[in-house]
A protein has these predicted regions:
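Phosphate-/nucleic-acid-contacting segments
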Residues: 146-192
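Cyclic nucleotide-binding regulatory module and flanking cytosolic helices
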Residues: 1-27, 83
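Short, Lys/Arg-enriched anionic-surface-contact patches
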Residues: 79, 138-151
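Short, well-ordered alpha-helical scaffold segment located
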Residues: 76-77, 109, 132, 181
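A small-molecule sensor/coupling module
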Residues: 90, 109-144
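Cyclic nucleotide-binding regulatory domains
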Residues: 10, 36-96
Length: 192
């Protein structure tokens, strides 16, 4: 739990009283490799901190092709935010790429703490600003304005060591390229 608190306080400081109230909402959950935390079409009500393991969020096009939107590793918050906030079904599926240990909480119960714990509300706002606004915008711009090699190098910085933990085709999908293109990029970088 201390590792989680440290990670949270990198975003925003919270009081001991707020921490106690928040941790009372957490319950452990295990998701096996290939298991689903939230499926496209489900109404998301929960969010989860990743204690251990790797998860991806992806969507499918009309033909069924999968596109990776993001990855979640230790310390990250996984949530179908659009579904939780809008009350509409999720467009994303959250799949475990390894066995995953989660600390799960009900989002509405978390919001219920805001009246007495303003620091938790501030934490959520800062998390949303950082992860779901700033980083999302930067990624969208990178997908259009940078070459695949630059996107791959940025992926390595954003997710250190992840490329050794997940299949390469998931990375290629995230970068918006084919697995063959990714192999060529990796080969060129190793040669230089």
């Amino acid at each position: 739990m201390e590792a989680l608190r440290t990670k949270i306080e990198e975003i925003s400081a919270i009081s001991d009283r707020s921490w106690t109230a928040f941790t009372a909402l957490l319950s452990p959950k295990q998701v096996p490799k290939g298991g689903i935390f939230c499926r496209e079409g489900d109404l998301a009500r929960e969010a989860a901190f990743i204690k251990e393991g790797v998860m991806r969020a992806f969507f499918r096009d009309a033909e069924g092709a999968e596109y990776n939107k993001t990855f979640f590793c230790e310390g990250n918050l996984a949530c179908s935010l659009a579904s939780v906030l809008s009350g509409q079904p999720s467009y994303l599926t959250f799949e475990a790429l390894s066995p995953v240990s989660l600390l799960v909480f009900n989002y509405q119960e978390f919001q219920g703490l805001f009246a007495q714990h303003r620091d938790l509300e501030s934490l959520l706002r800062k998390l949303l600003e950082q992860k779901w606004v700033v980083e999302k915008e930067q990624r969208e711009i990178r997908l259009v304005t940078t070459k695949a090699t630059e996107r791959y190098l940025h992926f390595q910085k954003e997710y250190p060591g992840l490329e050794n933990r997940i299949p390469q085709y998931h990375i290629a999908s995230y970068l918006g390229i084919s697995p063959t293109q990714l192999s060529r990029i990796r080969r060129k970088l190793m040669e230089s």
